[in-house]
């Protein structure tokens, strides 16, 4: 199977970019470096003619005007009739009502294939309050609110949605992928976002290639968009290593886009919010065949919690769990013990309010570790977020036989309380089993944490599948 950069260079798609005049030259140079052929016709009389010959169309609102809107509408309708990819960059949506209306009009009147924007722009398209700061928008990883907004836009308009930031998200409304690539210098060069949009268009025009995206699933457009963003981000990382500042970075970035070779592996994966859908807590006493059944059922988040065994036995048991998780592509976090997590090579830790502070764990484990925090109040949730937590465990939601000293249950409101206070994925825990997961998801949870409902079931694999199916239906990832 050829790589995405190779496919673009082999097929040399003609990309018609109706982009903003501030970044037009940069976008054209970037497309040429990537192996595509740019054409930048913006006039309302000319744009439909060019779109009739193009392999892909980019609609960018950066320097919007009524005349440019008309050109985009007419070119977009020609492109839609021809069935070529149309990629919208809703620059400034949410910043002014005019831009938001313009972006929505294009989505309603043109068959848009993909939208690429920052978190504030995507929130605005979903009808929610966002934050737009110039052309770059808010920093950081898209939180659950942004992810939900992206899925809503994708479902409403039948398109792909890409949210770019420190971590990029791509969704078709059901499948969602997270892309880890890029460098802070990219935000200091005007037009890197515009160029990323154009690369998405070129990638979609070049097609999906002949090979599989996974062991049992063919490549889809959502994979192609994720690869295009990885291409841009990887070029940015490589350019930064050779640059002394924004000026030299810009030249190095174009050079890196022109390089051939594979993209780095392991940078595209389901986001943490999807892995958290079913979160199972195991111990040293969990039989290996039970753990295997749970993982085969689709669980992709395991917590190892063991307080009774001596430390050497904990280490041995945790290592077995780690190996099982790796075979299935699941994440492993260790309850409380940062030292044990480091020793077995776990993906991270889960910390209670009386454990090592989140900030200290982050310093020890580094920026890529997954760190969860147990929270019951809005204040605890905000503190965990500010300290660097990746997700929150909230509960007890219901009465739980697994932890008799957990106190009175809060009901699903505990999930709503902490998820509204801190825009992090939340896992509800405590007494959750089949038939009880949907209300927790409706309250704002990304998933549910379980122990006895799965591990104590006559058929742990079937119980895990039942709860996971309930969660996915409640999240809208599968049909009810």
Curated annotation (Swiss-Prot):
Binding residue positions for ATP: 116, 164
Pfam family, one: HK
One CC-aspect GO term: cytoplasm
Catalysed reaction, written as an equation: 5-(2-hydroxyethyl)-4-methylthiazole + ATP = 4-methyl-5-(2-phosphooxyethyl)-thiazole + ADP + H(+); 2-[(2R,5Z)-2-carboxy-4-methylthiazol-5(2H)-ylidene]ethyl phosphate + 4-amino-2-methyl-5-(diphosphooxymethyl)pyrimidine + 2 H(+) = thiamine phosphate + CO2 + diphosphate; 2-(2-carboxy-4-methylthiazol-5-yl)ethyl phosphate + 4-amino-2-methyl-5-(diphosphooxymethyl)pyrimidine + 2 H(+) = thiamine phosphate + CO2 + diphosphate; 4-methyl-5-(2-phosphooxyethyl)-thiazole + 4-amino-2-methyl-5-(diphosphooxymethyl)pyrimidine + H(+) = thiamine phosphate + diphosphate
Residues that, per the record, bind 2-[(2R,5Z)-2-carboxy-4-methylthiazol-5(2H)-ylidene]ethyl phosphate: 400-402, 431, 451-452
Cofactor requirement: Mg(2+)
Residues binding 4-amino-2-methyl-5-(diphosphooxymethyl)pyrimidine: 303-307, 335, 374, 403
Keyword list, A-Z: ATP-binding, Kinase, Magnesium, Metal-binding, Multifunctional enzyme, Nucleotide-binding, Thiamine biosynthesis, Transferase
Record keyword Nucleotide-binding present: yes
Entry GO MF terms: ATP binding; hydroxyethylthiazole kinase activity; magnesium ion binding; thiamine-phosphate diphosphorylase activity
CDD domains per UniProt: THZ_kinase (cd01170), TMP_TenI (cd00564)
Amino-acid positions noted as binding Mg(2+) in the UniProt annotation, renumbered to this chain: 336, 355
UniProt xrefs under SUPFAM superfamilies: Ribokinase-like (SSF53613), Thiamin phosphate synthase (SSF51391)
EC number: 2.7.1.50, 2.5.1.3
Gene Ontology annotations of biological process type: thiamine biosynthetic process; thiamine diphosphate biosynthetic process
Co-factor remark: Binds 1 Mg(2+) ion per subunit.
Amino-acid positions noted as binding 5-(2-hydroxyethyl)-4-methylthiazole in the UniProt annotation, renumbered to this chain: 40, 191
Pathway where it operates: Cofactor biosynthesis; thiamine diphosphate biosynthesis; 4-methyl-5-(2-phosphoethyl)-thiazole from 5-(2-hydroxyethyl)-4-methylthiazole: step 1/1; Cofactor biosynthesis; thiamine diphosphate biosynthesis; thiamine phosphate from 4-amino-2-methyl-5-diphosphomethylpyrimidine and 4-methyl-5-(2-phosphoethyl)-thiazole: step 1/1
Region span, Thiamine-phosphate synthase: 288-480
Region (Hydroxyethylthiazole kinase): 1-287
Family: In the N-terminal section; belongs to the Thz kinase family. In the C-terminal section; belongs to the thiamine-phosphate synthase family.
Function of the protein: Condenses 4-methyl-5-(beta-hydroxyethyl)thiazole monophosphate (THZ-P) and 2-methyl-4-amino-5-hydroxymethyl pyrimidine pyrophosphate (HMP-PP) to form thiamine monophosphate (TMP).
Annotated protein name in UniProt: Thiamine biosynthesis bifunctional protein ThiM/ThiE
């Amino acid at each position: 199977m050829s790589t995405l950069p190779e496919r673009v260079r082999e097929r040399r798609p003609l990309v018609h970019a109706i982009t903003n005049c501030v970044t037009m030259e940069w976008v054209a140079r970037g497309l040429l470096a990537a192996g595509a052929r740019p054409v930048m016709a913006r006039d309302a009389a000319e744009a439909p003619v060019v779109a009739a010959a193009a392999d892909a169309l980019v609609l960018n609102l950066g320097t919007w005007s009524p005349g440019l809107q008309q050109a985009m509408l007419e070119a977009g309708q020609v492109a839609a009739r021809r069935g070529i990819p149309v990629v919208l960059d809703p620059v400034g949506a949410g910043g002014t009502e005019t831009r938001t209306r313009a972006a929505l009009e294009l989505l309603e009147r043109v068959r848009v294939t993909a939208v690429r924007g920052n978190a504030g722009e995507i929130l605005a398209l979903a009808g929610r309050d966002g934050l737009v700061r110039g052309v770059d928008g808010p920093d950081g990883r898209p939180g659950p609110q942004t992810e939900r907004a992206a899925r809503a836009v994708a479902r409403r308009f039948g398109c792909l949605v890409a949210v770019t930031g420190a971590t990029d998200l791509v969704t078709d409304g059901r499948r969602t992928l997270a892309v880890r690539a890029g460098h802070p210098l990219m935000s200091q060069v005007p037009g890197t976002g515009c160029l990323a949009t154009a690369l998405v268009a070129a990638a979609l025009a070049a097609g999906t290639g002949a090979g599989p995206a996974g062991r049992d699933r063919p490549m889809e457009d959502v994979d192609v968009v994720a690869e295009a963003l990885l291409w841009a981000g990887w070029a940015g990382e490589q350019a930064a290593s050779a640059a002394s500042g924004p000026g030299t970075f810009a030249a190095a970035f174009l050079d890196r886009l022109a390089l051939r070779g594979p993209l780095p592996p392991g940078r595209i994966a389901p986001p943490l919010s999807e892995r958290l859908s079913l979160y199972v807590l195991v111990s040293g006493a969990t039989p290996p065949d039970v753990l295997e059944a749970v993982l085969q059922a689709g669980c992709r988040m395991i917590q190892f919690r063991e307080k009774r065994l001596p430390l050497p036995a904990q280490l041995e048991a945790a290592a077995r769990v780690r190996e099982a998780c790796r075979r299935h592509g699941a994440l492993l976090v260790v309850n409380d013990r940062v030292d044990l997590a480091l020793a077995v090579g776990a993906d991270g830790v889960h910390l209670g309010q009386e454990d090592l502070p989140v900030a200290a764990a982050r310093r020890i484990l580094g920026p890529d570790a997954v760190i969860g925090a147990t929270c019951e109040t809005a204040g605890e949730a905000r503190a965990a977020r500010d300290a660097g937590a990746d997700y929150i465990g909230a509960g007890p939601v219901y009465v739980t036989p697994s932890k008799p000293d957990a106190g009175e249950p809060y009901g699903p409101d505990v999930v709503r309380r902490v998820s509204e206070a801190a825009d992090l994925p939340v896992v509800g825990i405590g007494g959750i089993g089949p038939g009880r997961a949907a209300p927790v998801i409706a309250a704002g949870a990304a998933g549910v944490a379980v122990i006895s409902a799965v591990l104590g079931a006559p058929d742990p694999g079937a119980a895990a599948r039942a709860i996971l199916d309930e969660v996915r239906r409640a999240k809208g990832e599968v049909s009810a």
